[in-house]
Amino acid sequence: DCPVGLRQGCILSPVLFLFFINEIAASVDENGIHGIQLLPGLVELFILLFADDIVLLSDTARGLQNQLNLLNDVCKNLFLNINKDKTKVMVFRKGGFLARNEKWTLNGVDLEVVNEYTYLGFVFTTRMSLKRGVDALAVKGRRACVDCIRHISKLSDISCFFKIFDTQVQPVLLYSSEMW
């Protein structure tokens, strides 16, 4: 039993979480935290937010640690807990190993460095190869297609099959297609 907070499923929960997420994003922005340059001098990306997922982006080890420290401080001030077991670090590089001093912590706890990470259903790898992610999506698409074909014999009209395909299979096949 949790003595504070809202019950799971409470209609206020998403609204309050939006306030918290906006506070976190504003704090990162206001504190001069740097991210990665998408367009030099024009676009800098330092945080990705979706639902209750937060991705911090930095082009240096120190920059990422600064972001983690700030996130931890803001969450403490908002009485939010970060699940350290779900918090991972991924370093994108062409090759080689991490230096011994390339470690990241959150509130004194070492964070796991991973070689691949699934974000919003797409698998990213440290070498930024899209192959692993595309292969995983192809498997999902194949499964959806097989499920659709399995039910075709039960349909009296082929147009129903195409409608089912367009709504159940095509979205799976096209998911993240902008990336590949």
Regions found by a protein language model. Give the residues of each.
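Amphipathic alpha-helical interaction motifs in eukaryotic regulatory proteins
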Residues: 17, 21-29, 72, 76, ...
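Non-catalytic, peripheral interaction segments enriched in hydrophobic/basic residues
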Residues: 51-52, 83-88, 92-94, 118-180
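Catalytic palm subdomain of template-directed nucleic-acid polymerases
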Residues: 5-6, 47-77, 92-96, 126-131
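Short, conserved micro-motifs composed of acidic
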Residues: 81-115
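Hydrophobic (often cysteine-bearing) scaffold residues that line and stabilize catalytic clefts
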Residues: 12-20, 47, 64-67, 137, ...
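Active-site nucleotide-donor binding segment shared across nucleotidyl transfer reactions
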Residues: 32-49
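Conserved pre-motif C helix in the palm subdomain of viral-like polymerases
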Residues: 3-34
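Short, isolated positions in well-ordered beta-strands
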Residues: 12, 45, 111-112, 118, ...
